[in-house]
Amino acid sequence: MATNLKSIAKLQKPIQYDKVIEVDRIFADPAFIEQHRQRILASFKDAKESALYHELTHIVIKDNLFSAAMNEIVSYFEFQINPEELKNVVEGLKRDVVKDADEKTIQSIAEKIIKKALVFNFLQKEWKVEVSDDIVKRVISLYYEKTNQNVREYLDDKQKFEGIRTALIEERMVLETINHFKFHFNLTGQLPS
């Protein structure tokens, strides 16, 4: 999680975690699904198609619940986005992620990334979410057991070790965010107009 942000988020009122969030659509971006499919196959070469399908379905649902929860949480904050920080994120997106989108879309994605980081920093402190060295080592060991790939570089390289910790904190924050709300699915099957 980015902790040295120049942008600012100010909580305007207490977050109402007892609110039921309405989910009326499930979004599944083909590029997002393919990215996760490749990541899973790279880690678990012998993954059965049914297990892969189950995992991808789980990822899509989790992503949709998280997005709905974040849309709710963000409404409780006021943001001051630092222009230089926004420019850096936009440039990074253009270079590494979003190749064919228009400027307005890229700008919107960049703002969401910054807001998510700011909200995560706030909530991580509020919820006291931490990941110890022992947990990071255990996850690295489990990865080795499942894949038989060399993990020494993750144990010996402080930057890679901290990268694993950051990924684990982010995953815990996603799950905590989802678990703080109740959701109601109202999937009527209507096509967007």
UniProtKB/Swiss-Prot annotation:
InterPro entries: MPN555-like, Trigger_fac_C_sf, Trigger_fact/SurA_dom_sf. One of its GO terms (biological process) is protein folding. SUPFAM superfamilies: Triger factor/SurA peptide-binding domain-like. This is Uncharacterized protein MG377. It comes from Mycoplasma genitalium (strain ATCC 33530 / DSM 19775 / NCTC 10195 / G37) (Mycoplasmoides genitalium). The lineage of its organism: Bacteria, Bacillati, Mycoplasmatota, Mycoplasmoidales, Mycoplasmoidaceae.
